[in-house]
């Protein structure tokens, strides 16, 4: 069971050591967890996942919480992978989801800005179309696991049309892209 695995692999002393480490988690333990299928728990089988539901995800998260496990699961699976699953293109799903399920790709959501507002009106970072891509201008703060993420899912304001919840886009940005500072 998840509880038995975490009790054995993630004792309190191990958790404290991971918290002191600059990476913030154990890559070896993360790989074991992905081999158990946890990173792809909710992804469809066609993307290397198990095809389970939010119920199974919640059970697993309860056990994570019980063990105080520091890992890239929340950032990579919940705030990066699930938005791609539910809103990404077919090509994005095919590219990112199998790599996440296999433990070969880490991602995170860059949402918080200096205003610290989680409301749509708090998204001020701008994205302007340029040469087939976008130029992003602004600052994101408190981006969980940004220092280890291969890709950031960045919430930006791409249009001023409509109300404050309109004109917001999520852009995939390589973690090593020019201008990305961690």
Region locations from a protein language model:
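A short, Trp-centered hydrophobic/proline-enriched beta-strand micro-motif
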Residues: 103-112
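A structural signal for short hydrophobic beta-strand segments in well-ordered beta-sheet cores
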Residues: 125-128
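Helix-loop "lid/cap" segments that line or gate small-molecule binding pockets
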Residues: 79-88
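Amphipathic, small/basic residue-rich leader segments at the start of a protein or domain
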Residues: 1-74, 90-91, 95, 99
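Short, solvent-exposed loop/turn elements at beta->coil junctions and helix N-caps
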Residues: 46, 112-116, 141-142
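Short solvent-exposed loop/turn micro-motifs enriched in small/polar/acidic residues
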Residues: 118-121, 164
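Long, well-ordered alpha-helical segments
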Residues: 2-12, 88-95, 131-137, 170-180
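A short core secondary-structure module
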Residues: 133, 137-181
């Amino acid at each position: 069971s998840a509880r038995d695995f975490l009790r054995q692999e993630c004792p309190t002393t191990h958790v404290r050591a991971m918290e002191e480490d600059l990476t913030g988690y154990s890559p070896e333990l993360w790989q074991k967890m992905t081999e158990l299928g946890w990173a792809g728990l909710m992804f469809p089988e066609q993307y290397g996942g198990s095809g389970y539901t939010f119920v199974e995800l919640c059970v697993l998260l309860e056990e994570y919480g019980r063990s105080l496990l520091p890992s890239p699961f929340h950032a990579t699976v919940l705030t990066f992978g699930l938005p791609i699953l539910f809103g990404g293109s077919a090509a994005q799903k095919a590219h990112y989801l199998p790599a996440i399920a296999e433990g070969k790709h880490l991602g995170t959501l860059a949402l918080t800005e200096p205003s610290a507002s989680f409301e749509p009106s708090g998204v001020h970072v701008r994205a302007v179309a340029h040469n087939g891509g976008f130029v992003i201008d602004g600052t994101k703060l408190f981006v969980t696991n940004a220092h280890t993420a291969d890709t950031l899912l960045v919430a930006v304001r791409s249009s001023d049309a409509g109300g404050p919840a309109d004109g917001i886009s999520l852009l995939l940005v390589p973690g090593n892209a020019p201008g990305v500072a961690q």
